[in-house]
Amino acid sequence: MTRVKSKLDEELSSPWFYTVCTMGGMLSAGTTHLAITPLDVLKVNMQVNPVKYNSIPSGFSTLLREHGHSYLWRGWSGKLLGYGVQGGCRFGLYEYFKTLYSDVLPNHNRTSIYFLSSASAQIFADMALCPFEAIKVRVQTQPMFAKGLLDGFPRVYRSEGLAGFHRGLFPLWCRNLPFSMVMFSTFEQSVEFIYQKIIQKRKQDCSKAQQLGVTCLAGYTAGAVGTIISNPADVVLSSLYNNKAKNVLQAVRNIGFVGLFTRSLPVRITIVGPVITLQWFFYDAIKVLSGFPTSGGVKKPVDAAKLSV
């Protein structure tokens, strides 16, 4: 048993495993974000102009009436490529840092490992995403700005230089770091809870279909909780990109405390919950097809008295 466990640990820290995780993250994040581009267009416009776009049904009606169906897919290339790159870094580096921190911090509890791993991965993931996000938000809210990435990148560079591509990096970190930390930790804890308290079986004793079902349930829970935590920074980010405010402090004053937590929250939950669920499902399905177990658990559980999932 020890030899089998040791062999599995070696496989889960191999270059091939991290490659699979990175590719799985790219495919799952890029495709799911592409699929919900119309909702994202509505969300960004609700954040920038909440009076005009004050609900999901009326917001869609206004966009369709004024701009047509094609407008709902503006920024699709930024969604596909930007969030694909971000997803590869987020998932691939999370697995790497989780193994690393489990080895160098053996006496810390698992929640600390999840927080540190997800935060470390997200820092690099957002640095990769930021240039794409800078173009995407402008394309979605400023009809005359550009059609997509090809003409959007040169325009930002001419008007703002390289700094324009990373103008929103700090608020992006403020949005995504709490989201990622809460999302990954909630996912891991949810997986453990489902196996121990609901199914009451070890992961390896469940079928692959059951394991993927657990992944979906834990993924939706993680996405919903993370959305609420990250909503204020998401609203501020849209305000900055559309020149509604010169800095974060001014944006917060303009939006108001209540608005930070409520503006566009319903549409964000509508978007993020299913998206995170599908991301985890596709991600774990790719891992299973590659011969690896589904996600959940650390390499070296700190509390040996409990079953590791």
Curated annotation (Swiss-Prot):
It comes from the Eukaryota. Solcar repeats lie at residues 16-100, 109-193, 210-289. One of its GO terms (molecular function) is phosphate transmembrane transporter activity. It is a multi-pass membrane protein. One of its GO terms (biological process) is response to salt stress. Residues 1-15, 95-111, 188-208, 290-309 are mitochondrial intermembrane. Expressed in stems, leaves and flowers. Strong expression in the stamens of flowers. Its main location: mitochondrion. Residues 37-74, 133-167, 230-268 are mitochondrial matrix. It is found in: Mitochondrion inner membrane. Induction: By salt stress. Belongs to the mitochondrial carrier (TC 2.A.29) family. PANTHER family: MITOCHONDRIAL PHOSPHATE CARRIER PROTEIN 1, MITOCHONDRIAL, SOLUTE CARRIER FAMILY 25 (MITOCHONDRIAL CARRIER PHOSPHATE CARRIER), MEMBER 3, LIKE-RELATED-RELATED. This is Mitochondrial phosphate carrier protein 1, mitochondrial. It comes from Arabidopsis thaliana (Mouse-ear cress).
